[in-house]
């Protein structure tokens, strides 16, 4: 049960990335009865959760590690994702290292420059890639220990452009052109991107578990 009621947080997204929080709120808007996504879905900083070191070797391991740690720290249902870009000719790299491919975590511009330079000689026909996401939900037991856990997956396939295009989104959005599209992910509206994105697919697959977890917490 949520004893605070009102606008108290009910769901924590285990990230400090405002772009991811914005995407999750839009995906959840209107999907969970009685949930005010603008006040009750918060990020790790707002919930007072600690930073989590990603020590897993797969997207699923990292997402579960983060969700579990935040659920234990806050006593609330927690969601985490680990996502990245998998480039065919690079054997799936950058993969779990996508956010720090150039060395500094979250330096999108440097990551893009390095990736494009590494692929400069790769012909268009071999520039296939995909955004991959593993999204995890962790619901603590009443004593604060790990309880129910669920992991779902999503993928967005496309090709890598030779130059960044568009100003929307974040990360590698400016260089991935989804299959069947003539625009980059960064040129899509938020609604268009959420409808096809890897993160959108993973979180939509997770929605039934989220709804059930929040319903049980209010019972």
How would you describe each model-predicted region?
Residues 2-12, 18-219:
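Anionic-ligand binding patches
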